[in-house]
Design a protein with these regions (language model features):
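Short E/K-rich amphipathic alpha-helical oligomerization segments
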Residues: 58-76
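Extended, charge-rich alpha-helical interface modules
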Residues: 78-87, 91-94, 112-117
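Flexible domain-boundary/linker segments
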Residues: 28, 65-69, 91
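Short, surface-exposed, charged amphipathic helix/loop patches that serve as local interaction elements
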Residues: 17, 43-64
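Amphipathic alpha-helical coiled-coil segments with heptad-repeat character
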Residues: 43, 50, 72, 76-79, ...
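Conserved short "hinge" loops at termini or chain/domain junctions
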Residues: 1-47, 94-117
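Small-residue hotspots
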Residues: 49-50, 57, 86-96, 100
Length: 117
């Protein structure tokens, strides 16, 4: 697919990686060049989203690390479990992968007008 501003915006929505107000693409997990690469390699937007969610699962693993909770004195902090976040990202990738498979791509038809007597 050829990346356009509209496709970038739609893919960011599907990946839940929208640019914050007053921010830039550097404020998200995917730069515009990353989004363009996903779009270039995909046959449709859902295939790009599936690949993006798979990459996002790996990013979450790196970002969250292995710490699930810690305490400082009387205070205790519990974080979202890494496995839950990774499972969610992979489930989203699977959902978009199924949508990509069932989505009809572009079709080119050639119609020849009938001969009229």
């Amino acid at each position: 697919m050829t990346p356009t501003a509209e496709l970038r915006t739609k893919l960011r929505k599907l990946l839940d990686e929208q640019i914050p107000a007053g921010g830039s693409d550097a404020d998200t997990r995917f730069l515009d060049t990353d989004i363009d690469e996903l779009l270039n390699e995909a046959t449709n937007i859902y295939e790009a989203a599936a690949t993006g969610w798979t990459l996002k699962a790996a990013m979450l693993q790196r970002e969250l690390g292995q710490v699930e909770s810690y305490s400082v004195g009387q205070e205790r902090y519990d974080m979202r479990k890494l496995q839950d976040m990774v499972n969610y990202a992979l489930k989203m990738a699977e959902t978009y992968s199924r949508m990509a498979a069932s989505s009809m791509g572009s079709v080119i038809l050639r119609i020849q007008p009938p001969e009229v007597l």
